Amino acid sequence: MREHYGVVTPMHNSRPRRVAVLSVHTSPLAQPGTGDAGGMNVYVLQSAIQMARRGVEVEIFTRATSSADAPVQEAAPGVLVRNVVAGPFEGLDKQDLPTQLCAFVAGVLREEARHEPGYYNLVHSHYWLSGQVGWLARDRWGVPLVHTAHTLAAVKNLSLADGDTPEPAARQIGEQQVVAESDRLVANTTEESDQLVRHYGADPNRIDVVAPGADLTRYRPGDRAAARAKLGLDPRETVVTFVGRIQPLKAPDVLLRAAAELIARDPESTLRVLVVGGPSGSGLARPDALIELASSLGIAARVTFLPPQAPDRLVDVYRASDLVAVPSYSESFGLVAIEAQACGTPVIAANVGGLGVAVRNGETGLLVDGHRTEDWATALQSLVSEPGRLAALAAEAPRHAENFSWEHTADGLLESYRMATVNYNYGHGPSEFAPRRAGGLWKLRRAGGVRA
């Protein structure tokens, strides 16, 4: 069918040569586990690296957050990170970022204007803020837009933690626009695909389900005793670990309350809770607040706090743990669960969102319905009190994790890009470019015009 799409040029090949990836609110180079950096950062960087290894150049646009940020950084061969100055470097809350989207758009368009038309063959936006930018870039450049939401306001607002702040209506409106304008939508799971259809009216024929992954060359089973020695953990204790941003959505307090209940039931328990992460979001977001909670629950001596860890150190955290807990109220997938299982560590997780895919219930971990302290304590106790069961889960966990790699993710994304490009070219035909304007900028003329 490709012959029906007109003259084939690099811009109109089904496989892109160069992709503009948009990650407005957080840099792929930021340390996951603090601020707004989390699984999305890992996703953007690792998928870009894998696509570059397949011959697709990737340029990631993100908002500069420090005057020390170089305008361009090479993240890996074939992967550039462009730090766009849009608003103050520090002190700009995530909720205020929409006020700087015009400045960010200008930075992205100016970079493209330095090149010949067709320099970028496709735009892939991550999160709704980036989707707003991608929508305009798509229309200006005459290339397809692929969008990954990562989280959805409508879904988050249905399962808020106590003390958490609802997502504003403006975000849901913005998401609705991006869903309508994207040429392809990438969902982490079939459940997320269903949510896009149910809450945003997305066309299911434009959704591609592509699971995230883990770096399976890094995250793999290792010596638990050696890992505990590196972290200063007692080899005789049973370690249950939380890894992630300290915010109501991630629910580290659920783990602490469950641990306190378990210890109250069994004072001889050797349970140790390890919390690895930094503050983010609203409500119960300060590490100090968790420290105070542990103290009020009478388990302060049983809880160890560590700051966010770099990947080579995070491997030791997973290996040192008997169990990793993911008690989130909402989770589109849950990379921590896959990374932990890849290291041979079972996972106990809330039965929400993509965690039902990331964890194989009863085989590589345990899924808990709801967030009641009693239920979580009982689930924890059922695992830590039965070493044989825990060992069986640990043995199966890496085999399950092998199904999730960034190589598989990149292959899925490239297929989505192919579909987006073929469909876009079929619907729009080749774009026309007017001569350069003064100052070296290109002006795009499209058959259907450019929406205001």
From Swiss-Prot:
Residues reported in the UniProt entry to bind 1D-myo-inositol 3-phosphate: 25, 36-41, 94, 127, 151, 171
GO MF, any single term: D-inositol-3-phosphate glycosyltransferase activity
Pfam families registered for this protein in UniProt: Glyco_trans_4_4, Glycos_transf_1
Reactions catalysed, as given in the entry: 1D-myo-inositol 3-phosphate + UDP-N-acetyl-alpha-D-glucosamine = 1D-myo-inositol 2-acetamido-2-deoxy-alpha-D-glucopyranoside 3-phosphate + UDP + H(+)
Enzyme class: transferase
Stored InterPro entries: Glyco_trans_1, Glyco_trans_4-like_N, Mycothiol_biosynthesis_MshA
Binding site for Mg(2+): 318-319, 321, 345
Assigned keywords, A-Z: Glycosyltransferase, Magnesium, Metal-binding, Transferase
Binding site for UDP-N-acetyl-alpha-D-glucosamine: 31-32, 39, 245, 250, 309, 331, 339
A biological-process GO annotation: mycothiol biosynthetic process
EC number: 2.4.1.250
Gene3D superfamilies on file: Glycogen Phosphorylase B
Taxonomy, superkingdom: Bacteria
Function summary: Catalyzes the transfer of a N-acetyl-glucosamine moiety to 1D-myo-inositol 3-phosphate to produce 1D-myo-inositol 2-acetamido-2-deoxy-glucopyranoside 3-phosphate in the mycothiol biosynthesis pathway.
Quaternary organization: Homodimer.
Family: Belongs to the glycosyltransferase group 1 family. MshA subfamily.
HAMAP family: MshA
NCBIfam families noted in UniProt: mycothiol_MshA (TIGR03449)
Name assigned to this protein: D-inositol 3-phosphate glycosyltransferase
